[in-house]
Each structure stands twice: as C-alpha cells, then as structure tokens.
Amino acid sequence: SERAIKWFAAGWLFLFLMRVGVYYHLEVMVILPLVFVSNKHPWRSLVAVIVASIWAGMSRVNWFPMPAMIAIAIYFLETPLNSSATESNSTSFKQILRYLSQPALWGVAGLISALLTQVVYVYLSGNSGNADAFTSSFTSDLLWYRLWPNANFPLGVIPAALLVSGPLIVTVTLATHQWKSLHSIRWLGLIGMLLALFAGSAVVSTKIGGGGDLHNMDAYAVLVGIVALYFFSGRVQAEPSEKQ
C-alpha cells in the first residue's frame, strides 16, 4: 500500500543517513522541511524553513542553506511549472519568475535566519571578542589528497561517496530519461543543487579534521536521498502535458 511504501522509504532514508554519518542534531533540519513544507501551505512552509534555518545557525556553517534547499527540492519535485497542458506549450518569462518566487523567498529567508542566529549565538556565548574562532573553518588548510584513497581513509572521500550513493544516482539518472515529464527549470534546479552540494561537501571534507569518513558529505547525501526517493516512490508531479 501507499502507506507501507512511505514507511519503507522513511526507514531506508534514515538508515542511509546513518551510514553516511549525518549526526542526530542535523536531522532536525531534514525532518522539519520534509514534514511541514508543501506548496499548498506557503506560510507554514516558510515558518518551517525559518525555524530549521535558525537551528542551522547554531549547528554547522555548511548547513546554513540546507533547510531552504530541501524545501526548494520538494517544491521542484511536487509543483509543476504550468497548471495546464495549454500553458506547457508556451511558458512565458513571467510564469517562470512567478514559479521561482517561492523558492527565492525560502532561500533568502533561510540564509538570513541562519546568519542572524549565528551572530546572536556568538554574542550570547560570551566569546564575541574571539569571533574569528567561529569562522576558522573558512581559513583552515585544504588537504586535497583526502578526496582520494589515502592512509587516513583507504577508499577516499569521492570514491566512497559515489559508491554509497551510486544506486541513488542511478535512480535519478534513469528518471532523466523521461526528462519531458518535468520542465527544464525544475531539472536545472534539482541537478544544480545536487552538483553544488557534492562539490561543496567534497571541499569541506578536505578541511583539517575531515576526510576520515563520509560525514562531511552529509548535505549531499541528504538531498540525493530525498530526490531519489521521490522518483522511486512515484511522488514526483509531472507537467500537465506529460500526465497520463
């Protein structure tokens, strides 16, 4: 049944994230958008993104954009750009701007919430005089060799990440064979975010203290897991002209 599939998908995603190494406190930023974001409830969705982003501001800097990115991915997966087959034949620039206005709002609101929260957090911590300590991750050395097989991580970050997420990548790749089912704007948004998170997570893995396992690839793992499960469970909403 549909209910059983949902529980199976949720259970599998939880186990996958545990295998990658997504820490429990970071999963708050995954659960809130998944539970509360919906194109039918814009205000509830915005509140969920802001609350999750506030938590991100107290957690990890490379997760600042994640609540908004998860919400945007859900939006691209569930919301067709056009409301009818007639509109699909001639999408105007105005329609595209209107469609992207919601994701843009989430992105801006989420980042501002996370950044402001970090400022407040630094101040309340009593270490505002040593604020540079909170941004040391931006200035630490990059150990690029950790991306590939090495003594610290025999498999290497990139090969291991591709191996673990391989079935998910295959699922998304197979879905692109039906590329007309989604407007190109939706595909560009989804694939662009996945590539950005893979590259960004790989860079974070080269920082001192990272690269010994896959825990710094967590942001990428979360999004590719969500996107792949949407396609696998048939929850992606096609454009009207492609619906059977």
Question: Where are each of the predicted segments found?
Answer:
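Transmembrane catalytic cores of multi-pass membrane glycosyltransferases
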Residues: S1, G11-H25, R44-V47, I54-A221
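Short linear functional motifs in flexible/disordered or boundary regions
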Residues: P67, F231, A238-E239
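Signature aromatic-anchored transmembrane alpha helix within multi-pass, membrane-resident enzymes
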Residues: I5, L100-V108, V236-Q244
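Alpha-helical transmembrane segments
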Residues: I169-L174, A228-G234
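Hydrophobic transmembrane alpha-helices
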Residues: I31-K40, V49-A52, I70-N82, G225-S233
